[in-house]
């Protein structure tokens, strides 16, 4: 179920009008079959694609009243709660999800993000450390921790994590500029330019890095 929901939301190829039409049809079907959880999950998906966070949250809540361990509903309700800035509720949903399925990177990173928004920096750091330990081959795990460390001005730690992320995804331009940004904050322009040159050698288009080359002058 959770995998199917990720695929569906990731595709999101329909136009807004098509999503609105889907909502209308699904409302009629739910009125006929109010106990059908699949229909409610489909409607919530459409609501999310229309950025109707409250409607989506309410559908996931209806699902969870019937099936309190429904992973798709827990995960995506947490996402909706985050969009609605209801961070404590989002945290509770992520924690409930992870209690059932602890080895889920996106949920762990979602929880870390919410903890940051709640001002719980130590807890957020612990969660990011846990993500890296559990997923040592994940670019996203290292990048998330590096972004947090950069925000906290922990630049040496951030550089290590940006390097680890780049080791796993050497042709990712966003990772390159993130590392370069930290080097420039430290006044290490020569190293920043060398990092850009290395990225170009790896196959990243130099034009995409022009702004950062200018900052290295």
Enumerate the language-model features and the residues they cover.
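Structural signature of tandem alpha-helical TPR/SEL1-like repeats
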Residues: 16-25, 51-62, 83-96, 118-130, ...
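Bacterial N-terminal signal peptides
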Residues: 1-8
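Terminal, low-structured helical/coil segments at or just beyond the last alpha-helical repeat
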Residues: 17-22, 181, 185-217
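Helix-start (N-cap) detector for alpha-helical repeat units in TPR-like alpha-solenoids
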Residues: 37-38, 71-72, 105-106, 139-140, ...
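Position-specific recognition of the canonical hydrophobic site in helix A of tetratricopeptide repeat
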Residues: 48, 75-82, 116, 143, ...
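N-terminal leader/linker segments that initiate helical-solenoid repeat arrays
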Residues: 10-54, 58
């Amino acid at each position: 179920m959770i995998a199917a929901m990720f695929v569906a939301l990731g595709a999101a190829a329909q136009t807004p009008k098509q999503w609105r039409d889907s909502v209308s049809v699904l409302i009629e079907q739910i009125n006929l079959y109010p106990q059908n959880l699949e229909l409610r999950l489909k409607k919530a998906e459409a609501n999310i694609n229309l950025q109707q966070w409250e409607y989506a949250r309410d559908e996931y809540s209806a699902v969870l009243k019937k099936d309190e361990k429904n992973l798709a509903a827990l995960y995506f309700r947490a996402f909706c709660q985050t969009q609605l800035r209801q961070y404590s509720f989002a945290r509770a949903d992520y924690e409930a999800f992870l209690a059932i399925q602890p080895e889920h990177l996106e949920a762990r990173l979602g929880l870390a993000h919410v903890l940051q928004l709640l001002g719980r920096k130590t807890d957020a750091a612990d969660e990011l450390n846990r993500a890296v330990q559990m997923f040592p081959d994940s670019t996203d795990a290292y990048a998330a921790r590096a972004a947090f460390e950069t925000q906290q001005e922990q630049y040496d730690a951030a550089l290590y994590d940006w390097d680890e992320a780049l080791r796993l995804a050497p042709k990712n331009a966003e990772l390159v500029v993130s590392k370069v940004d930290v080097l420039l904050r430290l006044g290490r322009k020569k190293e920043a330019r060398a990092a850009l040159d290395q990225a170009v050698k790896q196959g990243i288009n130099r034009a995409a890095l022009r702004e950062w080359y200018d900052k290295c002058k």
